[in-house]
Amino acid sequence: MQSGHYNRRQSRRQRISSNTTDSPRHTHGTRYRSTNWYTHPPQILSNSETLVAVQELLNSEMDQDSSSDASDDFPGYALHHSTYNGSEQNTSTSRHENRIFKLTEREANEEININTDAIDDEGEAEEGEAEEDAIDDEGEAEEGEAEEDAIDDEGEAEEGEAEEDAAEEDAIDDEGEAEEDAIDDEGEAEEDAIDDEGEAEEDYFSVSQVCSRDADEVYFTLDPEISYSTDLRIAKVMEPAVSKELNVSKRCVEPVTLTGSMLAHNGFDESWFAMRECTRREYITVQGLYDPIHLRYQFDTSRMTPPQILRTIPALPNMTLGELLLIFPIEFMAQPISIERILVEDVFLDRRASSKTHKYGPRWNSVYALPYNAGKMYVQHIPGFYDVSLRAVGQGTAIWHHMILSTAACAISNRISHGDGLGFLLDAAIRISANCIFLGRNDNFGVGDPCWLEDHLAGLPREAVPDVLQVTQLVLPNRGPTVAIMRGFFGALAYWPELRIAISEPSTSLVRYATGHMELAEWFLFSRTHSLKPQFTPTEREMLASFFTLYVTLGGGMLNWICRATAMYLAAPYHSRSAYIAVCESLPYYYIPVNSDLLCDLEVLLLGEVDLPTVCESYATIAHELTGYEAVRTAATNFMIEFADCYKESETDLMVSAYLGAVLLLQRVLGHANLLLLLLSGAALYGGCSIYIPRGILDAYNTLMLAASPLYAHQTLTSFWKDRDDAMQTLGIRPTTDVLPKEQDRIVQASPIEMNFRFVGLETIYPREQPIPSVDLAENLMQYRNEILGLDWKSVAMHLLRKY
């Protein structure tokens, strides 16, 4: 398995290095000024520690060495401009402060219009003005006419009307013949571009099939209408013109006996591995893919997001941008992204839905409202084999889309760039790591450390804590409207396609994989309750309480890992590697999900005695909730394995990709856990239902939300139900306690899930003869009136007066 990881990264590193040497060159700055940008234009900053502009730095380099061509000195670079106090240009700052964004061939491969890139190459080699005219024509003309116009301009400059007529004849040829004739006329530059990009685009945009290859280089064909399953993991993946769906391996194990845990300083001995000896089963499940070819003729594929601006982060005020990028090399993530790649990535996330229940799924870039039935909303449980009410599911999905996705998309799109999103994730990661250390136990750190419910955050030993993470009080979130938007909407940043693409593969696929399943589970959750009938069935309440406990434990394990990874990044060079062995070794994560013995114990204690296949068949909500939890556990574990493997191979770009991907997924996990608690609290307080949770899990949840407050803004019970009622009123949906009439009783069958969930071990470290005691949720919530319920001080005072 590790050889598969190694081969995949080796091939990627070789591909990037080979592509960088012969990447197409453009007139710097002109390419993005001449196009119609999809988002707001880049900002000009006044901070001398930020980036320098394209033309100013290029001119300064040309003045220093007039004998050399600027395009040879800076192949494929895009730069930004900074001034002192907004007036004086800064061209003498250090090389690290004037950070350069490299646009490698990997980004060039993501552009759809191949012939335009080839014309750019030839235009730069022959005449600088010809390239600028061709790029200007590309932004204004239709996609089908862009190649013809560019060739016409080139023909007028070189060979006149004769070559122009030949280009027009080539433009009307069929499919591959048109590109081959154009290659013969334009020369070797365009032929090289076609060799690099043409095959990936042709394979990916095939209407009838999508080709991929497995670890043994065996190609297999995926039909969009059929689901496939194979036991081979994708180990070496091509990077096509768009973000291609990577198959995520789920690490399932047979029952084993766990008898203890191990600290980091003890090392990995044979007895420790013997306790976790098991047979792993890895598989891939590929569902039907949407064919994105129709997007090619609806959107201008030449458009790109503007060049991104990276800033210093407030969490490290004494660190310059150059020093920050040396530690966290995220500049490759800030490259402009093609609009078509964004749209296709948005479609990939939507493909998780069932065609029977969701013919049209919500998307980030949706411009139309989802179809639903206005009027009364009936939320009773439908008994049967995956039976659900199509009316209720459509209404619940519309409410979810209105409250979370569409609101977040309107607040972020065209206002916040994915470069700002990367900066927010990095700043929040450092802040939550400091809070984890401040609130943690500061002892018993290491692999397999059982973070029990009352003390969920492990923290770090004092000798392993960097100076920048040693705080004497809780670190608060950064201020500003942009930060407030990115912290809200139940962790909606994972739905942002630009940000998922920016963190690069395989993190893009991991986040998409987990987010898609959690999204589908939330659609069904929103279809089961409203303010007049917030109750679930007893089975649903019991199972949702168990999943809430598991999500809190999983989120705490992810926060502990992020804290240790951040400390390793910021630690002084003299720190021993053994202090951070928990994030540098990948082997433990192959045996224990998230390397958390507590999580494995709780899975057995809460779900071990449940007949999961029968429950999932009778309750579609529980079925998708189980699938969502399994997907999140798999994705989080894969992030940790990827980080450790990249550390061994010294691949810093993939390390930081896995690091930020885990931070992004943690925000979505916190949002889903918040939503589960609000629904359970509504059933307990508003519906009068008895719900029991393990004692201490609500304390762990409150501590987790307090530590992760720079990353996620917790939503209270009162604000959630008020926002939900407002959304229903806006959509014209009325809550009712009536039973669904038979004439409107349209029952459909949701797609059955694959019962692939496995327990790590049927034996637990926690003594089975002493089960975890439970408490009533309604009584336990009274301890957190302000934090969870959202009651103001006047309401609390009135409650105390009535009580005493």
Curated annotation (Swiss-Prot):
Q: Which UniProt keywords apply?
A: Host cytoplasm, Host nucleus, Late protein, Repeat, RNA-binding, Transcription, Transcription regulation, Virion, Virion tegument
Q: Please give the residue ranges the record annotates as the region 6 X 16 AA approximate tandem repeats.
A: 117-203
The cross-references to Pfam families, in alphabetical order and at most eight, read:
Herpes_UL47 (PF03362)
Q: One cellular component GO annotation, for this chain's record? A: viral tegument
Q: Which parts of the chain are sequence repeats?
A: 117-132, 133-148, 149-164, 170-180, 181-191, 192-203
Localization, per the record, is: Virion tegument; Host nucleus; Host cytoplasm
- Annotated motif Nuclear localization signal: location in the chain? 11-31
Motif Nuclear export signal: positions: 770-792
Query: Where in the sequence does UniProt note compositional bias of the Polar residues kind?
Result: 32-42, 82-93
Keyword hit for RNA-binding: yes
One GO biological process term is: regulation of DNA-templated transcription
Basic residues: compositionally biased ranges: 1-15
Does the keyword field hold Transcription? yes
Q: Region Disordered: list its residue ranges.
A: 1-42, 58-206
Cite the GO molecular-function annotations of the record: RNA binding
> Where are the bilayer-spanning segments?
none
Instruction: List, alphabetically, the InterPro entries matched.
Output: Herpes_UL47
Q: Where is the composition biased (Basic and acidic residues)?
A: 94-109
Q: How is it modified after translation?
A: Phosphorylated by US3. This phosphorylation is required for proper nuclear localization.
Query: Per the record, where are the segments of Acidic residues compositional bias?
Result: 62-72, 118-204
* Domain notes for this protein: The nuclear export signal is CRM1-dependent.
The entry assigns this protein to a family as follows: Belongs to the alphaherpesvirinae HHV-1 UL47 family.
Q: What else does the entry mention about this protein?
A: Expressed in late in the infection.
The record describes the protein's role as: Tegument protein that can bind to various RNA transcripts. Plays a role in the attenuation of selective viral and cellular mRNA degradation by modulating the activity of host shutoff RNase ORF17/VHS. Also plays a role in the primary envelopment of virions in the perinuclear space, probably by interacting with two nuclear egress proteins ORF24 and ORF27.
- Complex and partners: Interacts with US3 kinase. Interacts with ORF24 and ORF27; these interactions seem important for efficient virion nuclear egress. Interacts with ORF17/VHS.
Q: What is this protein called?
A: Tegument protein UL47 homolog
Q: Which organism is it from?
A: Varicella-zoster virus (strain Oka vaccine)
